[in-house]
């Protein structure tokens, strides 16, 4: 929660540049995404800690309570992810929860990646979307009782 509180909205930031470079231009209902200009990155091998600009995504439960955060460290040019061995990491309680775009209704779409779901959101702007962050988490995601139709979005990777 502190990381999310220390970050800022994405408008006019490197996150917006990164998403637009990914051809994601329609950025509505993206309050779950934030920007941190100097987010710590600790390598898995125990190397020195570095700071990079990052896209911070709030992971929330069905009630909107923040349960975790997902970080995508960005290249300073905004053209892609930072040149790190692991440019994405999540922390907190993720199982059953998701990064949410739009208000939950009776029809929703759920998939793994943030960028995948935002790309689909451009074609289907009225459907709420959820990014589970991994295939394992997608299989465990909790859905609202109001859900009547669910579209599962497949990543090609």
Describe these PLM feature segments.
Residues 41-149:
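Phosphate-handling DNA/RNA-contact segment within nucleic-acid enzymes
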Residues 1-2, 102, 152-153:
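A short, structure-level motif marking secondary-structure boundaries and short turns
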Residues 1-55, 60-63:
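TOPRIM metal-binding catalytic domain and adjacent DNA-binding surface shared by DnaG-type primases
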Residues 136-138, 154-157:
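Acidic, metal-coordinating catalytic cores used for nucleic-acid/nucleotide bond scission
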